[in-house]
Structures are given as structure tokens and as C-alpha cells.
Design a protein with these regions (language model features):
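Juxtamembrane intracellular "pre-TM" segments in multi-pass secondary transporters
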Residues: 168-204, 229-234, 398
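A membrane-interface helix-boundary motif in multi-pass transporters
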Residues: 136-156, 355-373
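Central cavity-lining transmembrane alpha-helices of secondary-active solute carriers
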Residues: 26-44, 244-259
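Hydrophobic core of transmembrane alpha-helices in multi-pass small-molecule transporters
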Residues: 63-66, 76-96, 207-208, 297-312
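C-terminal ends and interior cores of transmembrane alpha-helices
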Residues: 61-75, 278-292
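Helix-to-loop junctions at the C-terminal end of transmembrane segments
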Residues: 37-51, 138-139, 255-269, 357-358
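Helix-loop boundary and gating motifs at the non-cytosolic
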Residues: 1-32, 198-234, 241, 245, ...
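Cytoplasmic helix-loop-helix junction between adjacent transmembrane helices
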Residues: 84-122
Length: 398
């Protein structure tokens, strides 16, 4: 669903619709707006009233409907509005999917640290398949990735997954709220995690690093497509099949997911997150150095390090939250993690990135992004206090 448009939408907006960098950034900031409250609200509903697997299907149905509406729009305001509404119902599905997967592993009495990453790999495989499809498929002689057809493809997949979601193992809900406080009833207990200094610092840096998550999604394809206007790169295979090149990032992600259990047990969450932050520095830096000609190797290296940059933060962070929280607030806690990363982080990061691109252009913008990631890494190393206990990560079987 996401792979059909997340990587290629920026190039369509900038090239096909001639939107500015700030406008392009605003579309990716919709994920931030939605994540500020929708994952937490849906997490509360999943914990208290509607089983997570059913709520997952409902969200995909509604999100797909708004994607269909968005595909027919070309003006900024209506297109932005439809995408915002679609994303509002899509973003909660990430945390809900995690909860449904953890529940299935729990029912099977399997170790989440060991068995969740291999399951999560298939989400990345689907993402890659969708990217290749929109890059290689032409309608009217034009690649889908350069047109609104990418949104129709995503909508179709949303409807398919909605139907499938209803067949997944049932998740429990707690409807017995008579003896609970209103905080428990609303699922707000997860926000009490901010009272714990270590968790508060973890969530704050999740927000700071979350600002980097959507930058290459928004502008990676746009940047590579810009090389097509230069005579020496006009016929470059990298420019023509930029989305396939970018899919190397997801291939790297597929491999790196499998490394998470080892790295978490060996090094702990702090070092794993530091590795992720430094990988983001390289991700942006290599983009700035690279080009479709003599600098092609740097573009490829940027794709290779993406797996470490994304997985070592996103997946490991989710598992860390899973380990640190109780069953009663687990879905809500995953929602809070989403708020900080894909909420505040993505919102401010996407708008800031769009402003930087409009002001500084290419390739200087990449160096600014790399510098930001480096500063966050250095501060995190000194501020986040965590003593790794390998036994804690040896088994997470709730």
C-alpha cells in the first residue's frame, strides 16, 4: 500500500504538478499530523472496545476510499485534503499491525524478539514489489510512478488488505471499565511513561530522529529525477528507473531486520539507536555526493545504509516499547511511540526539509540534513542513560 506511492509521490507532485518543495513536504507532513493523535486513539479503541484485527480492516477500507478520491485531484488544496484524510486512517494501521502480530506470537507462545523481525520482513518485500510495479508499469506510455495511477494501485491494495485483516487471529479487548479511573478508561495510562526519565528521553529522541524518516521518501526520487534535466544524465538508467534504485533501500531493510535480535541482545537499545543515527548521517551525505554518473556508487551506498538507519531505530524502538510496557497499555504505548516518531518528528521534519530544499537546493540540502542527524547522535550519546542487560532482551514473551 505505502510502497505504491510513498517513494514516488514526491516526483509526481514536483514534476507532474509543479508543486514547491514546501508543498511537497506538506504532503509528507500529513503523516505527522495523523500520527499526533490517530494511532493513540485507535490504540485506545483496540485496547478497550474493538479487536485490533477488525479495527485494522476498517482503517484500510476508509483509507483506500480517500486514496481513490485523491487520485482524481490535481490542485493543491483538494489533493492535499484527500491525502490527509487517507493518511489519518492509514497511519494507525502500522501500530495496529504490530499489536496484531505480537498478539499472534503471544498466542503461539513464541519469542517476539526472535520471531517478529522475520515476519516484519514480508512487509518490506511487499513494499519493494509495489515500488517495482509502479516503476516498470506504463499506462499511456508513461510510467505509473509519474502519474496519479500510483494512488489507484495503493487504493486497490488497501481494499485487499482490509478484507484479509478480518481473518487474522482475534485480539482481546478489556470492556470491564467500571472499577477503572477515567485515565485507564481512555487509555491514557501509556502517557504516564513520560514520568519515567529513561522513557521520556527515549521518546524525545524518537521525535528528533523521526524528523529524518520522511526526508528521503519525500525528496529522494525528486532529487534523482532532477538529474534528467542535465544533458549528460538525460538517458541514464538511474534516472529512468529511479524508484527501482531507491528500492535497494528496502532490500537493505529486509536484510537488516534479521540483524536486530543479535544487535539488541549484544549491544542494547542505546548503541543500536546510535548506530541508526550515524547511518542517517551517511544516508544523507552519500545522497549529496552521488550522481547518476561517476557518483553512482555513492547513491548505491546511500541505499545500502538505509536498512541500518531505518530498522535499527524503528523496529528496535517498537520492540523496546513492547518490553517496557504492560499488557494493559501495550497498544496505547505503541501509539505513543508513533506519535513521537511519525507524529511530531515527521511533521516538523517534513516542513523543515521542504523549506531547506526551497532555500538551499541540491546538493547542499543533503549536507544540512546529515549535519542535523550528527548533532542528534552526539547529544543522544550523552543524554540517554541506559545500562544494557543482555538477559532482558534474551526473551520477550508476554
Amino acid at each position: 500500500i505505502w510502497g505504491s506511492w510513498l517513494i514516488s509521490l514526491g516526483a509526481y507532485l514536483g514534476g507532474g504538478l509543479d508543486f514547491t518543495g514546501l508543498q511537497i513536504g506538506s504532503f509528507f507532513a500529513t503523516m505527522g499530523i495523523a500520527s499526533l493523535f490517530m494511532p493513540a486513539v485507535m490504540g485506545i479503541i483496540a485496547d478497550r472496545w474493538i479487536p485490533a484485527q477488525k479495527l485494522l480492516g476498517i482503517c484500510h477500507l476508509i483509507s483506500g476510499a480517500f486514496l481513490v478520491a485523491a487520485a482524481s485531484q490535481t490542485a493543491y488544496a483538494p489533493l492535499y485534503s484527500c491525502m490527509l484524510l487517507s493518511v489519518m486512517f492509514y497511519m494507525p494501521t502500522i501500530a495496529l499491525s504490530n499489536s496484531v502480530a505480537y498478539n499472534a506470537l503471544d498466542l503461539a507462545k513464541l519469542d517476539t524478539v526472535k520471531h517478529f523481525p522475520p515476519i516484519r520482513v514480508w512487509g518490506t518485500v511487499g513494499f519493494i514489489a509495489a515500488m517495482w510495479f509502479v516503476d516498470l508499469t506504463h499506462i499511456g506510455g508513461i510510467q505509473i510512478k509519474l502519474t496519479a495511477w500510483q494512488l489507484y494501485v495503493s487504493a486497490f491494495l488497501s481494499f485487499v488488505l482490509a478484507v484479509y485483516s478480518f481473518s487474522l487471529p482475534g485480539c482481546s479487548v478489556d470492556r470491564n471499565v467500571k472499577s477503572q479511573s477515567w485515565i485507564d478508561t481512555l487509555g491514557l495510562r501509556a502517557f504516564a511513561l513520560f514520568k519515567e526519565k529513561r522513557m521520556a528521553v527515549f521518546f524525545i529522541f524518537s521525535m528528533l530522529l523521526g524528523a529524518a524518516l520522511q526526508i528521503t521518501n519525500a525528496f529522494g526520487d525528486t532529487y534523482i529525477q532532477n538529474f534528467g534535466s542535465m544533458p549528460q544524465y538525460a538517458d541514464s538508467a538511474i534516472v529512468k528507473h529511479s524508484v527501482i534504485l531507491l528500492s535497494l533501500s528496502q532490500m537493505s531493510e529486509t536484510f537488516c531486520i534479521l540483524l536486530i535480535p543479535f544487535f539488541l541482545r549484544r549491544f542494547g537499545i542505546k548503541k543500536v539507536m546510535l548506530i541508526s543515527m550515524l547511518a542517517w548521517v551517511l544516508r544523507f551525505g552519500f545522497f549529496g555526493i552521488g550522481n547518476p554518473g561517476s557518483g553512482a556508487a555513492f547513491l548505491i551506498l546511500s541505499m545500502v545504509v538505509y536498512g541500518v538507519a531505518f530498522d535499527f531505530f524503528n523496529i528496535s524502538g517498537s520492540l523496546f516499547v513492547e518490553k517496557e510496557t504492560s499488557r494493559e497499555i501495550r497498544s496505547s504505548a505503541q501509539g505513543v511511540f508513533m506519535i513521537m516518531t511519525n507524529g511530531f518528528g515527521a511533521f516538523f521534519g517534513s516542513y523543515a526539509a521542504g523549506a531547506v530544499v526551497d532555500a538551499w537546493g541540491w546538493p547542499d540540502s543533503w549536507y544540512i540534513f546529515a549535519g542535523y542527524a550528527l548533532v542528534v547522535a552526539v547529544v543522544f550519546a550523552f543524554v540517554f542513560k541506559y545500562k544494557h542487560n543482555p538477559a532482558e532482551m534474551a526473551s520477550v514473551n508476554h
